[in-house]
From Swiss-Prot:
Residues 165-276 form the ELM2 domain. The modification N6-acetyllysine is found at residue 614. The lineage of its organism: Eukaryota, Metazoa, Chordata, Craniata, Vertebrata. The modification Phosphothreonine is found at residues 564, 578. There is a cross-link at residue 549 (Glycyl lysine isopeptide (Lys-Gly) (interchain with G-Cter in SUMO2)). It holds the Pfam family ELM2. CDD domains: BAH_MTA, SANT_MTA3_like, ZnF_GATA. This is Metastasis-associated protein MTA1. The gene is Mta1. The modification Phosphoserine is found at residues 386, 449, 522, 576, 627.
Length: 703
């Protein structure tokens, strides 16, 4: 019952989205609307993930400690050798990376922003406290639902400010304390230079005479306000003018004038009414206009007694001293007393607490086991496992959980276990640091285990945006041994041809462990390599002479710039057309493909430039309807990566491939965006390979 009772001042979780983390808010008011619902007026707290990276770097810089150390000959006296440097918190350095990662999830940023949210969106209580340097950082991790903050975030101005004052430590900021005087020792300092007397207690006047002089000073102040036009506007009645003249600034000025005139009342009265007119003393209550007073009350309602923020956001033309002085005078006015009584009456009529039952509705991100398609991949699990059990949790990498939740973009098909989902909703992050953060070289998104072997995704963030994600297969030593010892059980060729057939990796591992002691005693049988005789090698070299070195190739930009849309020939697509309007490889590179209707095009003699399968003729003009788009003069962007394609080689491409050396073929495969310079030469007709010699006698070559 007490856990579901929420009061003003509680820190609570609010849920605004089923997939996003909870919002952390502090309840300021509980109001009941006209339709009977309860709304909570709350103060916003922001997480590190909610603010920009530049402000995060500024916050991390603020978290460093300034340590002063002394070195050199003046270390004892402190006269020289004092150096100040910024170092990281030593306690933060000793923490492991996992705890550092989780500690960042506990840091919040306070804001002055208020918003109203439905009370039914509350999902639980939490605790938020100001960062205390005397407490251990681990203490924040040991307590559940515990957060801390040290900076104030302004979502409108996008700035960070310190929430408390700082005390600077060091000889430059501390007062010099003199030595303690001994008993009977006199102070040699001149006290007249250290103190200023403003009133003489043993003066010749009695208290009655001083009171009469103060009455005269109030009368002079009232008369001065009657003569001043601006004061007449601000104080329209005689009663208000007399009240303004009776404030402390008039009395202090009268007593100061009496002290300066050596307590001679006649001279003091003459000083209050000089030749130009009576002296007018006004304080901050009279200096401020009505509009400025309204701005101050509005700022005080929003920021409280944070006079620095009041000055910056509402009254930048006023000094901080003037604002503070006006505040303490404003508290003595009748307006403040009336507002205080009105707020107390409103607080009595408002709700003090509200009961919110537990939220038991199912989350839309829950993964239903019955709705998962029952198709598995090699290594996803043994027969009898639930579908999709091979995909591990993105946070803790477990494969067993009573409930799974979808997490991240839908195309990534990532999921979290029940405990990690709760951690994600409360703390706004994963338990383990990700590889994208640069904190560990562990698995990344879409961690799958084909054939029961751990797979590690690529750490580059660009792969996270692709529909099909590349992965790196890291085989262990035991896996490589199992491929040889348990070949009849594993059947690697069959598994490669049927990647959707499940493989019982546990049984293979057990069988490999049983066969391993026997296999270590028998030597490994290596496959014998049959070498060709020397005569066959000589005949092959005679038949296939070394091709001449090609001429230097022009740069890709110059080659592409010389082509015009009318001279650009499309590529014949011999594969099946894409479905659902998917773009082909040629469309990604700015070249449209023609449909192949059973026609065969032959390579012309002037077609001497190939861009990895795309021919660019210089003289042949293709007759077709419409115009071709120009070729893009840039490399293919990784975002525009094509879908999987099927390349069917023709007789023309086979002939062209035979004209290229192996180094040119490999170079073209490594740089598919580079054009291929093909030297036009008549290819020699291929002769059948010579038969192997009958005799095994060596061949002797005489000079």
């Amino acid at each position: 019952m007490a856990a579901n009772m929420y009061r003003v001042g509680d820190y609570v979780y609010f849920e605004n989205s089923s997939s996003n983390p909870y919002l952390i808010r502090r309840i300021e008011e509980l109001n009941k609307t006209a339709n009977g619902n309860v709304e909570a007026k709350v103060v916003c707290f922001y997480r590190r993930r909610d603010i920009s990276s530049s402000l995060i770097a500024l916050a991390d810089k603020h978290a460093t400690l300034s340590v002063c150390y002394r070195a050199g000959p003046g270390a004892d006296t402190g006269e020289e050798g004092e150096v100040e440097e910024e170092v990281e918190n030593p306690e933060m350095v000793d923490l492991p990376e996992k705890l550092k990662h989780q500690l960042r999830h506990r840091e919040l940023f306070l804001s002055r922003q208020l918003e109203s949210l439905p009370a039914t969106h509350i999902r639980g209580k939490c605790s938020v406290t100001l960062l205390n340097e005397t407490e251990s950082l681990k203490s924040y991790l040991e307590r559940e639902d515990f957060f801390f903050y040290s900076l104030v975030y302004d979502p409108q101005q996008k700035t960070l400010l310190a929430d408390k004052g700082e005390i600077r430590v060091g000889n430059r900021y501390q007062a010099d304390i003199t030595d303690l005087l001994k008993d009977g020792e006199e102070d040699g300092r001149d006290q007249s230079k250290l103190e200023t007397k403003v009133w003489e207690a043993h003066n010749p006047l009695v208290d009655k005479q001083i009171d009469q002089f103060l009455v005269v000073a109030r009368s002079v102040g009232t008369f001065a306000r009657a003569l001043d036009c601006s004061s007449s506007v601000r104080q329209p009645s005689l009663h208000m003018s007399a009240a303004a003249a009776s404030r402390d600034i008039t009395l202090f000025h009268a007593m100061d004038t009496l002290h300066k005139n050596i307590y001679d009342i006649s001279k003091a009265i003459s000083a209050l009414v000089p030749q130009g007119g009576p002296v007018l003393c006004r304080d901050e209550m009279e200096e401020w206009s009505a509009s400025e007073a309204n701005l101050f009350e509005e700022a005080l309602e929003k920021y409280g007694k944070d006079f620095t923020d009041i000055q910056q956001d509402f009254l930048p033309w006023k000094s901080l001293t003037s604002i503070i002085e006006y505040y303490y005078m404003w508290k003595t006015t009748d307006r403040y007393v009336q507002q205080k009584r009105l707020k107390a009456a409103e607080a009595e009529s408002k709700l003090k607490q509200v009961y919110i039952p537990n939220y038991n509705k199912p989350n839309p991100n829950q993964i239903s086991v019955n709705s998962v398609k029952a198709s598995v991949v090699n290594g996803t699990g043994t027969p009898g496992q639930s579908p999709g059990a091979g995909r591990a949790c993105e946070s803790c990498y477990t494969t067993q959980s009573y409930q799974w939740y979808s997490w991240g973009p839908p195309n990534m098909q990532c999921r979290l276990c029940a405990s990690c989902w709760t951690y994600w909703k409360k703390y706004g992050g994963l338990k383990m640091p990700t590889r994208l953060d640069g904190e560990r070289p562990g698995p990344n998104r879409n961690n799958m285990s084909p054939h029961g072997i751990p797979a590690r995704s690529s750490g580059s963030p660009k792969f996270a945006m692709k529909t099909r994600q590349a992965f790196y297969l890291h085989t262990t030593k035991l896996t490589r041994i199992a491929r040889r010892l348990c070949r009849e059980i594993l059947r690697p060729w069959h598994a490669a041809r049927h990647p959707y057939m499940p493989i019982n990796s546990a049984a293979i591992k057990a069988e490999c462990t049983a066969r391993l002691p026997e296999a270590s005693q028998s030597p490994l049988v290596l496959k014998q390599v049959v070498r060709k005789p020397l005569e066959a090698v000589l005949r092959y070299l005679e038949t296939h002479p070394r091709p001449p070195k090609p001429d230097p190739v022009k740069s890709s930009s110059s080659v592409l710039s010389s082509l015009t849309p009318a001279k650009s020939a499309p590529v014949i697509n011999n594969g099946s057309p894409t479905i659902l309007g998917k773009r082909s490889y040629e469309q990604h590179n700015g070249v449209d493909g023609l449909a192949n209707h059973g026609q065969t095009r032959h390579m012309g003699p002037s077609r001497n430039l190939l861009l990895n399968g795309k021919s660019y003729p210089t003289k042949v003009r293709l007759i077709r309807g419409g115009s071709l788009p120009p070729v893009k003069r840039r490399r293919m962007n990784w975002i525009d990566a094509p879908d999987d394609v099927f390349y069917m080689a023709t007789e023309e491409t086979r002939k062209i491939r035979k004209l290229l050396s192996s180094s040119e073929t490999k170079r073209a495969a490594r740089r598919p965006y580079k054009p291929i310079a093909l030297r036009q030469s008549q290819a020699l007709p291929l002769r059948p390979p010579p038969p192997a010699p009958v005799n095994d006698e060596p061949i002797v070559i005489e000079d």
